[in-house]
A protein has these predicted regions:
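N-terminal Rossmann-like NAD(P)+-binding subdomain of aldehyde/semialdehyde dehydrogenases
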Residues: 1-142
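Gly/Ser/Thr-rich beta-alpha loop segments that engage phosphate groups in nucleotides
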Residues: 16, 99, 154, 230, ...
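Residue-level signal for inorganic ion chemistry
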Residues: 33, 70, 92, 178, ...
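Structural signal for hydrophobic packing residues in well-ordered secondary-structure cores
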Residues: 58, 62, 78-85, 89-92, ...
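Short amphipathic alpha-helical segments
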Residues: 63, 74, 168-169, 194-195, ...
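C-terminal segments
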Residues: 109, 114-124, 286-291, 331, ...
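Rossmann-like NAD(P) dinucleotide-binding subdomain of oxidoreductase/dehydrogenase enzymes
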Residues: 129-278
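ALDH superfamily catalytic-core signature
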Residues: 234, 242-334, 338, 382-392
């Protein structure tokens, strides 16, 4: 266990801490079914501490208004994550059974590299713009300004599939927008989150409370507390549709903004004039991490007249899919536990329709999910020295 160098503590109010009651739980390696280590089991009391820190940081520090500070902090964070990538890679494979090959792509390295997109967006984004004064039957001429402001305290609840990717897709845009964040990690893959806390603790430009990490067992009490608490402004949740409904119901009591990425897989549709030998090669992606991914096609629709031909091609494809030890870089299938992810880009909005979700991650649209839009009307004769007359 010691060779993994995994972080077992929570990250609350700028410090790595044990759970308040000292409780821990085992992290089980799905490949060997042996205990790989332990991690802190956060309670409702720990959730309260994290929310108090996040609320205090948002209201009392300059995090939400100091763009330069956020850029420095996120640059430090990105560089710190790159520096620990080799340790983190071993931890991810041990806790999730994710084939190590995928950690050199979307399940680790490229997700960290995608922080650059948020940094570039933060550097160039117009948080304030003037709009034309079209006049009004009430009052005199005014300077009208549309301002984007950080939405507040964000609770991010992430799944065990592609944990590093989903963690970063939620927390980085939220932090870049000026929100403070409490990340509740999936109980099966806690080290994908605790490493974030360890690295954040070493970033001098993160004020205490800007980012917090909680790991817990699967009882549901901590999640229920976080989604219902009035100190929370935004909930970003990825998981099942059934749990998403409960999150939405809980959040509605205090009218929280709710972003839901829920269950749902689309079929691969093959038309009757397709070259099946080429078209069906893509069906092999369902084997990545045994199909445990929301973007992996688990259904295939082919013309009835070409059914037998399709089955023969698929049989040949699947016989050649490499599987086994996830530490072997040649394998794309490990044990049943965690997800592979494909077709993502940092600048491409991703999300569900209908019952598969609300809101978007990635791209400008994902960034703006964590901003509030306000319009200010400042009379033309308003004193220029007033704070209201100054740009954001």
């Amino acid at each position: 266990m010691s060779h993994l160098n995994a972080e077992h503590r929570l990250y609350i109010d700028g410090a790595l801490v044990d759970a308040q009651d000292g409780q821990t739980y085992d992290v089980v390696n799905p490949t060997t079914e042996e205990i790989a280590g332990v991690v802190a089991a956060a309670s409702v009391a720990d959730g309260d501490r994290a929310l108090a820190a996040a609320r205090r940081c948002f209201e009392e520090s300059d995090w939400s208004t100091n763009r330069a500070r956020r850029m420095r902090a996120l640059t430090q964070f990105r560089d710190g994550l790159k520096a620990v990538a080799d340790d983190w890679r071993r931890q991810i494979v041990a806790e999730s059974g994710c084939p190590v090959a995928f950690t050199y792509g979307p399940l680790l390295d490229s997700s960290v590299a995608d922080i650059d997109y948020s940094l570039e967006l933060l550097a160039t984004y117009e948080f304030e713009r003037e709009i034309e004064d079209l006049g009004s039957p009430m009052g005199g001429p005014a300077r009208r300004v549309v301002r984007k402001e950080a939405a507040g305290v964000v609770v991010a609840i992430t799944p065990w599939n592609a944990p590093v990717q989903t963690n970063l897709q939620k927390i980085i845009p939220a932090l870049a927008a000026g929100c403070t964040v409490v990340l509740k990690a999936a109980h099966d893959t806690p080290w994908s989150a605790t490493m974030l806390g360890r690295v954040a603790s070493q970033c001098p430009d993160f004020p205490p409370g800007a980012f917090n990490v909680l790991t817990s067992t699967a009882t549901g009490s901590l999640g229920a507390m976080l989604t219902a608490d009035p100190r929370v402004d935004v909930i970003s949740f990825t998981g099942s549709t059934a749990t998403g409904r409960r999150v939405m119901e809980s959040a509605s009591k205090t009218i929280k903004r709710t972003l839901l990425e829920l269950g749902g897989k689309s079929a691969m549709i093959v038309l009757d004039d397709a070259d099946l030998s080429q078209a069906l090669l893509g069906a092999a992606n369902v084997c990545a991490n045994p199909g445990q991914g929301c973007v992996l096609n688990t259904r295939l629709l082919v013309p009835r007249s070409r059914y037998d031909e399709a089955v023969a091609i698929l049989e040949a494809v699947y016989r050649n899919v490499p599987y086994g030890d996830p530490n072997d870089a040649n394998n794309i299938m490990g044990p049943m536990n965690v997800n592979g992810a494909f077709f993502f880009s940092a600048n491409a909005p991703f999300g569900g329709y209908k019952q598969s979700g609300i809101g978007r991650e990635n791209g400008v649209e994902g960034f703006e999910e964590y901003l509030e839009t306000k319009t200010l009307a400042v009379p033309m004769d308003f004193p220029a020295t007033s704070a209201l007359a100054q740009p954001a």
